[in-house]
Every structure is written in C-alpha cells, then in structure tokens.
Amino acid sequence: MRIAIIGGHLTPALAVLEHLPKGMDAVYIGRKFALEGDTAYSLEYQAMHDRRIPFFHLTTGRLQRTFTPQTIPSLLKLPRGFWQAFRMLQTIKPDVILGFGGYVSVPVGIVGKMLGIPLIIHEQTLETGFANQILAPFADKICVSWKSSQKFFPANKAVLTGNPAVASLFEKSKPHRLTKGVLPRLVIVGGSLGSHAINALIEGCLEDLLKQYEVLHQTGDSKEFRDFDRLAQKRDSLGPILRERYTLTKFIDPDDIVSVFESAELVVTRAGINTITTLLLLNKPALVIPLPTSQKNEQLKNAQFFKQHNLGEIFNQTIGTPEKLFTIIDAMIKQKNSYTNTHATEELTTHKHSVQKIIDTVIYVAKKTSQ
C-alpha cells in the first residue's frame, strides 16, 4: 500500500510516517523552501531528505479568509497547484492520501478525490483549520485531536484519534546534550520556522536575561532576516561569562524537544497546538506569544486554552516591548511554583495511542475502497 502524505503540519505527519507497518510505503508532498522567495530549505524537506522519503515539491496559492494585497497573486497560483497535483498523483499512484492541514493539501486532496483516491485528513487544532474545512466534503474520514473539533465535521466522518505528534514526541524523547547549569534555564522557541518577531524581542533584552538566566534560543534559519547570524555576532560580542550562558541554534530536533522543555524553568514560545499540548502534559510553565496572523486567531485561542490550565501567561507581540518581555519572564520564573496544571483531564491522555488509531483508519478506508 502506498500513502501520499501532505504537509501541512510536519510533526504529526512524521509520527505516522515513522510507525507505518511493513507493506506500507509513503511519499511526502509539501514545500521545499521555508518561505516563499527564500532559499532556506523547509524543515519538512530536510526531515524527508534525512529519512530518505521521496519528496514532491508543490507550488500553489493560499486560499485566504480575508482579502489582502496578496490575495489575487495567490489565487493566480492555484491553477498551477492543481495541475502539479494532477501530474504528481499520476506519477505516485497512491492508494490513500493522508493530509495534515496546510494550503498545500487543498489541491492534492481535491484532485486525488477526482481521481478516485480515498482521502483522510487530520485536524490537530481545537477547532478546525481552513484547509481542512475545504477538504472535509471530499474526505472519507476526518481524524480529530480534540472532542471540541468533532462538532465541526459530519458525525459519520469524524474519528477521535488524538494528536500523533505529541505521542511521538514523548515516545522518542531522549536526554538532551545540555547539562543542568547553576542558573535557571530559559528556553525560547519560535516554531519550526523560527520567529523574527520573537527573535527581535529577545535581542532587545538579551543581556538583561543573561545576567540572571541561561538561555537556549531557537531562531530558525530565514535568509530574509538572518536572525541567527545577527544574534551569533551579538553573542560573540558579549563578555565570556554571558557568552557561555547563551546557546543559539537554528533548529531543535523534534526528538529533543521534550527533554529540552523539561530542562527549562520557563519556555517562551509560539502557541502552536503541538507545543501547547506538550507543555500541558509536561506541566511546564510558559509565556506564550500567539502568532497574530494565524487563521481564525487559532494561536490566540490555543494560548487562552493553555492559560485556563493555569500554566502560563500570554504576551502580545504587537504592543509588547523587550523591556516588558523581560519583566514578565523574570516575574514568572520567580513565581514558578504558582504555575501548575489544575485542570488535568482524561482528554490529554487520548493522544498516547493516536498514531495507531490513524494508521488503523488509513487501513480501514483503503480496504473499504478496494472492495
């Protein structure tokens, strides 16, 4: 059986890829480059290259909920995306398509259904992503991570599977090479691509942070902003004591993320649902900085969900300053004992078996279609 996996969200896709049983092989369709017009390879391309999984790069436009200056140029790319999807699927000849959200999944899912290929999609958010809303009428089954998502999809299609990304992160967690230092450790992550806004805020208060804390900072590798290079120069300009306290990295291996979070007194992060769920399961305090441009304010809702569990605070990057950021970080670390998950629920434990549930769904749909 051959599965075409569409990114989207990389971490849950990887979790399923790495647990496929014998007799199943997979290809991956996604973005080769991190940002449009950038030359840096995307994390999904690097991950597939490292695992020797065939990768197909698809160029298409984004379907947007609101009209922006990018709407028309983006729409003009859609026909190309559908044509590429048709050519790819004719070459790949998959038995099943498994989509993990994201705009790349739209043309592949629709064209695949037109070609008679069964489609399964996975929704990892608390509500529903725009791409999956579009694909839902075409999908044979819809795997959801949260009970709150079920009401957005037809009851005969929705299957509660949990989030495979989280289960995989804990399963593959390994001790990180960083040893515990004398000072409390602050871990700063900006998502798989990094965050220029977070990087700039941290840069503005870096020396104040390093006077009190060890800092592990994941910047991403954008060639447009070159944050890693600039911050590396700043690190080299610091005195030897502060320089030693600052660990700079472009990426954090997904296999390391649980142990990295465990080593932290506090995490500063975007509010992606995988990160939020992982932090909840670890009972780890965090200052979350929602991406203001996320669809349907998805990250803000994730951040509010996290704060309701009494594990963190929310920082607004559009009005926040480096000085304000430092003040909140400092206060949270000093009051860390006041942050603990007081609303632990059984729902969080459903993620543990999600990989197998999704694979079982894929096998069920493939067999049903072939009959």
Model-identified regions with their sequence ranges:
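Conserved nucleotide-sugar phosphate-binding/catalytic loop shared by glycosyltransferases and other
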Residues: 5, 25-75, 316-318
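Active-site-proximal region of nucleotide-activated glycan assembly enzymes
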Residues: 25, 54, 113-174
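Donor-nucleotide binding loops and adjacent catalytic segments primarily
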Residues: 35-41, 174, 180-266, 300-303, ...
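An amphipathic, basic-hydrophobic alpha-helix
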Residues: 60-96
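Acidic donor-binding loop of glycosyltransferase active sites
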Residues: 94-96, 261-275
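Conserved donor-nucleotide binding/catalytic region of nucleotide-linked donor-dependent transferases
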Residues: 313, 318-350, 368-370
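C-terminal alpha-helical cap of glycosyltransferases
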Residues: 350-371
